Structure formats: C-alpha cells, structure tokens
Amino acid sequence: MLSVNLKSLPIVENMIEKAEEMNIEVIKLENGATVLDCGVNVMGSIEAGKAFTKICLGGLAHVGVSIAGTVSDEMVLPCVKVKTSHPAIATLGSQKAGWTINIGKFFAMGSGPARALAKIPKATYEEINYEDNADVAILCLEASQLPNEEVAEFVAEKCGVDVSKVYLLVAPTSSLVGSIQISGRVVENGTYKMLEALHFDVNKVKFAAGIAPVAPIIGDDLAMMGATNDMVLYGGRTYYYIESDENDDVEALCKALPSCSSQDYGKPFLETFKAANYDFYKIDKGMFAPAVVVINDMRTGKLVTYGKPHVDVLKKSLGYKELE
C-alpha cells in the first residue's frame, strides 16, 4: 500500500536542501525533531507553498501555481491547480485538517501524512480503508507560532515513531504559504462534503482535479481565514471522475455538492463566521465546498456540472479596488 509519509519525505528533504532559495528556515529541536518554518518568522515563497501543499496531499498529487490564472475576465488572481489519481487517500487520508494540536500554549490545525499514522480521525480511515505504517511522521501545521520539543514528542507518540523522525511544517493563515495551501484544498473540500455531509462512498472517486484562486495577504489570521475560505467557496472549480454503481444518483450528487447548495451561501465567509459567534460547528457543513463541480460518471459516460464562481463576493471579501 502507498505510504503518504514516505511519498512526502523526498519533498521535505528537497525543501530542507533549498531552504534559503525557498525563503524558509529549518530548525532542529533538541530532541532531534525537525521544524520547517514556512511563514512564522520568514517570508516563504510560491515554491514553498507548492511543496507544502503537495506534502499535505501525501505526495500523491501534482500541484501548480499559475499567476495568470483567472476566476473570470473581471478578476485576475494567482491560482493553485491540483490533480490526483488517489483522491480519497490524498485528500481525506492526508490533506484533511482533522487533527487539532493543543499542547500548552501551542495551538494548530494539523493536516498531512502523519494523520494516517495516528489515524485521526479514526472513522475517516475506516471509510477509505487506508493506513500507513511508515517510520517517519510528517505533519503540516496551520499555526502562528512554532512548535517546541513537547509538541514533537506528542506527535511522535501518537504516530508511533521516534521523535528524531518527526518533521513539522508550519505556516500561518496570514502567510503566502498558508494562503496557497488553503486554496490547494479545493478538491478536498468536495471529497470531504461527499463523505461527511452527503455520505457518498469516496472510494468511487477515481481521479480528481481542481483550481482555486489564492487569497492575497489582506490582514491578520482572522481576516485571512475568511478570505482563504472564500477563494474555494466562491472561486474553486473541481472535476471528479466517479465510477458509480446503479444505485448512485450522480446528478443529485452534483447538485448537492457545490457551496451554492448551502443556506449560508452568498456572503463572505467571515460574515457567516461572525454570525455563528465564531463557532465553526454552528456553520452548515455544506458550505465547505467548491463553487463549481463537474462530474464525469465513467460507468454511464455522463458529464454533469453545477454551480458557478461568485466574483462579487470574492471582490467584497478582498476589498478589491479597481483603479481608474
């Protein structure tokens, strides 16, 4: 079985080798764990953002950033492009931000390959029938501070590896790398909704691709949390190749999948978050989805699509100003 940790290790090693070129910093902790600062005390880079995103996806996806990417003729933003031939494992078995790390004063959302060793959350791995038994643990952290030895020890223990084999990559939401990796979740937003909200067997998704604009750096972590979510919810476009069976209603799936099917659709995410008293669990799960979904049913040959980009919301979210 493919190992998301072993597939990601060469990418991590390449980042370490090219740290100066990528504007990142490599920190060796006293217990032997390795921290890659991709945006806390450094600037990061587009290349670091691509590598970080690819690691989040367990090394099982191609990731590109196109500065010429457009949401529409009205609005030009750089875009992240993702394609994978292992969508369930790459997005849900690795990329899903399913591990909350809360140790002392350190807090982060954890995603990436190490989740497959710790099996967090366990139900996800049972659904996709996947496990990893590598002796190295690579965890991507969305955080505004760097982890210490205690955090590394915690990860090592949960993953069943020696702490010297732990790699922790860190990028704040309000950093270039952080913004890129969140937009890089465009495909995962769809597979997550398929599994968690629509209870569709994601193992039937055989190939997937997606593109989403990258939010510019417009403010602090809270402002960027809103903007980065909006990039996918109102600008993300996805394509799923599905091997259905006779009982699947692919057209109904396609209509239910995009963010426009949610009751919270139509306003910047930060407004929705504030209305929910800053509680993610009060927000409709169906909101976390790409704007556009295209499904190719490989069994029937059908090609269906639903949803569209919402440029006006993107402009409002970013405070986009067209100069005259």
UniProtKB/Swiss-Prot annotation:
This one is known as Methenyltetrahydromethanopterin cyclohydrolase
Question: Which top-rank group of organisms is this from?
Answer: Archaea
Does the UniProt entry include the keyword Cytoplasm? yes
Q: Where in the cell is it found?
A: Cytoplasm
Q: Which parts of the chain are coiled coil?
A: none
The answer to whether keyword Disulfide bond applies is: no
Q: Which organism is it from?
A: Methanococcus aeolicus (strain ATCC BAA-1280 / DSM 17508 / OCM 812 / Nankai-3)
Enzymatic class: hydrolase
Question: Which Pfam families does UniProt cross-reference here?
Answer: MCH
Which keywords accompany this UniProt record?
Answer: Cytoplasm, Hydrolase, Methanogenesis, One-carbon metabolism
Query: Which GO CC terms are listed, alphabetically?
Result: cytoplasm
| GO molecular-function term, one example from the UniProt record | methenyltetrahydromethanopterin cyclohydrolase activity
Q: Known EC number(s)? A: 3.5.4.27
What InterPro entries does the entry give?
METHMP_CycHdrlase
Tell me one GO biological process term. Answer: one-carbon metabolic process
Which pathway does it take part in? Answer: One-carbon metabolism; methanogenesis from CO(2); 5,10-methenyl-5,6,7,8-tetrahydromethanopterin from CO(2): step 3/3
Role description? Catalyzes the reversible interconversion of 5-formyl-H(4)MPT to methenyl-H(4)MPT(+).
User: Which family does the record assign?
Assistant: Belongs to the MCH family.
